[in-house]
Structures are given as structure tokens and as C-alpha cells.
Swiss-Prot record:
Organism, as annotated: Bos taurus
Alphabetized NCBIfam families for the sequence: S16
First-listed, main subcellular location of the protein, grouped into a coarse class: mitochondrion
GO BP terms, alphabetized: mitochondrial translation
Keywords annotated in UniProt: Mitochondrion, Phosphoprotein, Ribonucleoprotein, Ribosomal protein, Transit peptide
Descriptive protein name: Small ribosomal subunit protein bS16m
InterPro entries with a match to the protein in the record: Ribosomal_bS16, Ribosomal_bS16_dom_sf
């Protein structure tokens, strides 16, 4: 079977499909469509297929609405489409991925913070040791 992305990307040299957000809506009222598009196309330009929508403005109940066609997203990922960071985060929040991306990010931040604390503690003990030797 021919890889579907190679057939669709023939017009775009060196390109690949990306699942990303396309901006819509009005001034001060953004609305995003989740689309499968070539990475060389403009953000709000032509796309291959719309896969969902995202309304970042909270409604009267304080909810941000997300609609996803998970079957088609699974299809495009199987065809080799890349994901943008915001879409990856939305899919993690919706439970599409087994691990939410912020869990990994928070773990890395905590690991760096602990390493820095250990380094500062070691420097502090070194300076205290040199001060006691001088006195």
C-alpha cells in the first residue's frame, strides 16, 4: 500500500502532514479548528480535513469546549501525520494519549529543581567549610 502522506504531499516538496490548530473567529473571540494540513501551508490556509474544533473562551458554565473526531485523528496519525504541541496537549487532556503531556513536563521541572537544590546545598556546605578553616 502506498503511504497516503506521500501521495498528498507531492505538490509540497519535503513537506509532511501536520495536525494543528487553524484560527477562526473574530477580534477578541478566537475559535480554532483542528485540521490536518500540509506543514508548508499557512496557518489558516488550505487544509486536507477538519478533525475537530476548540473554543478557548469559557461558556456560561466556565467550560472550554473541544470536539474531536478521534477515528480520523487515529487515521492521520497512522498515515504519519505530525502533531503540533497545542493539539498534543488537547489530545492528552481528552484521554487520547495514555499519559498527559503536562505530567512529563512537571516531572522534568521537578527533577531540574531538585538537582539545583542539591547543587546549592553542596555549594553552601563548601563555603561553610572554607569559612571555618579560615577562622
Amino acid at each position: 500500500m502506498v503511504q497516503l502522506t506521500t501521495v498528498l504531499c507531492k505538490a509540497y516538496r519535503g513537506g509532511h502532514l501536520t495536525i494543528r490548530l487553524a484560527l477562526g473567529g473574530c477580534t477578541n473571540r478566537p475559535f480554532y479548528r483542528i485540521v490536518a494540513a500540509h506543514n508548508k501551508c499557512p496557518r489558516d490556509g488550505r487544509f486536507v480535513e477538519q478533525l475537530g474544533s476548540y473554543d478557548p473562551m469559557p461558556n456560561s458554565h466556565g467550560e472550554k469546549l473541544v470536539a474531536l473526531n478521534l477515528d480520523r485523528i487515529r487515521h492521520w496519525i497512522g498515515c504519519g501525520a505530525h502533531l503540533s504541541k497545542p493539539v498534543e496537549k488537547l489530545l492528552g487532556l481528552s484521554g487520547f494519549f495514555p499519559l498527559h503531556p503536562m505530567v512529563i513536563t512537571n516531572a522534568e521541572r521537578l527533577r531540574r529543581k531538585r538537582a539545583q537544590e542539591v547543587l546549592l546545598a553542596a555549594q553552601k556546605t563548601d563555603t561553610e567549610a572554607t569559612e571555618t578553616k579560615e577562622n
